[in-house]
Amino acid sequence: MKGLLQRVRSARVEVGTEVVGAIDQGILVLVGIEPQDTRASADKLLHKLLNYRVFSDADGKMNLSLREVSGGLLLVSQFTLAADTKSGLRAGFSKAAAPALGAELFDYLLSQARIAHPVVAAGQFGADMQVHLINDGPVTFLFET
């Protein structure tokens, strides 16, 4: 499972003209699910997302986690993170999970996030989404579990 974390001042995701998820300060995470991923992969990723120190303390050092700043978590599924781009000029998606597994694991990740953290929003799995964000830093990390 891959999670591309971006620290944001705010972010929102729309499907058509409807806003389906939005946060103020926090992290936007694009989630890519692969065939070998399990609930354990999702649990490991969630632990990293909630506890990784990406926010600045009073001295300007990245010493604070999402939990410590009470920031928002916006999860957006993105199967293209599992793309194979090693050869040719067109991505291959054989390394992406099948839609049924992807939906199951994304829903699990989202449900566990809502249990563990007070401010959680999400995009719509499988939808054509427009993601708007104000990147803060920019600070971006790629996690692979």
From Swiss-Prot:
This is D-aminoacyl-tRNA deacylase. Keywords: Cytoplasm, Hydrolase, RNA-binding, tRNA-binding. One of its GO terms (biological process) is D-amino acid catabolic process. Belongs to the DTD family. A motif (Gly-cisPro motif, important for rejection of L-amino acids) lies at residues 137-138. It comes from the Bacteria. An aminoacyl-tRNA editing enzyme that deacylates mischarged D-aminoacyl-tRNAs. Also deacylates mischarged glycyl-tRNA(Ala), protecting cells against glycine mischarging by AlaRS. Acts via tRNA-based rather than protein-based catalysis; rejects L-amino acids rather than detecting D-amino acids in the active site. By recycling D-aminoacyl-tRNA to D-amino acids and free tRNA molecules, this enzyme counteracts the toxicity associated with the formation of D-aminoacyl-tRNA entities in vivo and helps enforce protein L-homochirality. The keyword Nucleus does not apply. It is found in: Cytoplasm. One of its GO terms (cellular component) is cytoplasm. The keyword Plastid does not apply. GO terms for molecular function: D-tyrosyl-tRNA(Tyr) deacylase activity; Gly-tRNA(Ala) deacylase activity; Ser(Gly)-tRNA(Ala) hydrolase activity; tRNA binding. It is an enzyme of class 3 (hydrolase). The gene is dtd. It catalyses: glycyl-tRNA(Ala) + H2O = tRNA(Ala) + glycine + H(+); a D-aminoacyl-tRNA + H2O = a tRNA + a D-alpha-amino acid + H(+). Its EC number is 3.1.1.96. Gene3D superfamilies: D-tyrosyl-tRNA(Tyr) deacylase. Pfam families: Tyr_Deacylase (PF02580). Homodimer. InterPro entries: Daa-tRNA_deacyls_DTD, DTD-like_sf. A Gly-cisPro motif from one monomer fits into the active site of the other monomer to allow specific chiral rejection of L-amino acids.
